[in-house]
């Protein structure tokens, strides 16, 4: 179902369901022979949610038991898991680097089923603020509580839609705009209209003193090329059909949740506003972590740039 200005969702529908897909990929990677990342809570989330398209990523045995489906989408599922594993590692290393530099205030925007507040070794005194839709945060908190999980930092949940005045909610929850902050906007930008993307980074910039850090992933140049869009749409249709045959559930069209609009280049914008920013392509990131780079542009993941930035002292 296409997006609307005031849409909302639970964890198993619309944008919320994409968080389960990411968690499923993290679960599969964690349980693989040589995992790049370790997320002990990813499987907990997936099991609590029940069956859905995410089952195809979280349970490789499903594909192994259906050779005709595995032959159609098995390689693409592996590509998605590799992408999510490297994406997770990128943001993990970003946060650990910021912590090593002395940052003790962290904001995870559109946190979804991000479990870093529970699994990363945060230094004493670290406060992690998580912002997302109320029902998404409720699902995550309840699921982790039922499994006896304890945060490894002071955790502040802020249930809010990022299209609303989230800076005010953040400040009301104790956020200190005078302290350096590590910000992440992981897997978020594609789900925002172009103007909302601009506003997001304007707000982050306003709340970030010298010493702050920022990481995000954004669409790569050329992502609106009509041939590329058509091929990726066809590939996603094949994957949805395969998942539907495996779990007998109608799958949402994830690409309908994205806003296909021309966007401000984030790394350039940050550089113009006093940040030192660098960008890495998804292909470069896969190579860095020793994962194969797909030899075509028809995979399930559109071309992506990973941006990291630091605001130095004036």
UniProtKB/Swiss-Prot annotation:
Exhibits S-adenosyl-L-methionine-dependent methyltransferase activity. InterPro entries: Ppm1/Ppm2/Tcmp (IPR007213), SAM-dependent_MTases_sf (IPR029063), SAM_mthyl_Trfase_ML2640-like (IPR011610). This is Putative S-adenosyl-L-methionine-dependent methyltransferase MUL_4402. Signal peptide: none annotated. Residues 291-314 are annotated as: Disordered. GO terms for molecular function: methyltransferase activity. The keyword Transferase applies. Its EC number is 2.1.1.-. It comes from Mycobacterium ulcerans (strain Agy99). It is an enzyme of class 2 (transferase). Keywords: Methyltransferase, S-adenosyl-L-methionine, Transferase. S-adenosyl-L-methionine binds at residues 132, 161-162. GO terms for biological process: methylation. Pfam families: LCM.
């Amino acid at each position: 179902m296409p997006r609307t200005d005031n849409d909302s969702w639970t964890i198993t529908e619309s944008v919320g369901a994409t968080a389960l897909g990411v968690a499923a990929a993290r679960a599969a990677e964690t349980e693989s022979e040589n995992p790049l990342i370790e997320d002990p809570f990813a499987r907990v989330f997936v099991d609590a949610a029940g069956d859905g398209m995410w089952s195809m990523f979280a349970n490789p045995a499903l594909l192994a038991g259906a050779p005709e489906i595995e032959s159609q989408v098995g390689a693409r599922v592996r590509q998605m898991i590799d992408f999510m594993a490297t994406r997770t590692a990128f943001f993990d290393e970003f946060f650990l680097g910021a912590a090593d530099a002395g940052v003790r205030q962290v904001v995870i925007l559109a946190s979804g089923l991000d479990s870093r507040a529970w699994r990363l070794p945060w230094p004493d005194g670290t406060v992690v603020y998580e912002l997302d839709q109320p029902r998404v945060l409720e699902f995550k908190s309840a699921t982790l509580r039922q499994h006896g999980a304890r945060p490894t930092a002071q955790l502040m949940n802020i249930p809010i839609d990022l299209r609303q005045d989230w800076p005010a909610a953040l400040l009301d929850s104790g956020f200190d705009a005078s302290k350096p902050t590590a910000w992440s906007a992981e897997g978020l930008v594609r789900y925002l209209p172009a103007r909302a993307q601009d506003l997001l980074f304007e707000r982050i910039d306003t709340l970030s003193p010298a010493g702050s850090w920022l990481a995000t992933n954004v669409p790569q140049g050329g992502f609106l090329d009509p041939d590329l869009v058509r091929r990726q749409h066809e590939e996603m249709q094949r994957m949805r059909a395969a998942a539907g045959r495996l779990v007998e559930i109608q799958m949402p069209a994830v690409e309908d949740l994205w806003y296909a609009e021309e966007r401000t280049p984030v790394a350039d914008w940050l550089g113009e506003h006093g940040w030192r920013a660098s960008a890495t392509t998804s292909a470069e990131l896969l190579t860095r972590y020793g994962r194969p780079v797909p030899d075509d542009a028809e995979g399930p993941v559109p071309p992506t740039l990973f941006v990291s930035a630091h605001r130095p002292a004036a």
